[in-house]
Swiss-Prot record:
The keyword Transferase does not apply. This is U3-lycotoxin-Ls1h. Residues 1-20 form the signal peptide. Keywords: Disulfide bond, Knottin, Secreted, Signal, Toxin. It comes from Lycosa singoriensis (Wolf spider). The keyword Signal applies. One of its GO terms (molecular function) is toxin activity. Residues 21-44 form a propeptide. It is found in: Secreted.
Amino acid sequence: MKFVLLFGVFLVTLFSYSSAEMLDDFDQADEDELLSLIEKEEARAKECTPRFYDCSHDRHSCCRSELFKDVCTCFYPEGGDNEVCTCQQPKHLKYMEKAADKAKKFGGKIKRWFG
């Protein structure tokens, strides 16, 4: 009976040790993957197209504003046959950003009043 108990404790110890090593390996792999994703994101962030610039080469390359990403909008200028695409902010998102900015300012005033 003692032999079975000692053998069981040995197996549990061995299993927990191997599980801990596997978890460490997974954590290290997750960290490496996260770092590579962050590096790619930083590299991609430098190549965004500013507002009102031509985005016909890549319609998903528009920069972000404070809260929302700008949208590549295409149109035909009056009297022209060529399509022109520029990064623009839709009006409803523009109004939402203004409302959020005013709410932040109002929240700051309330903090000062009751702070």
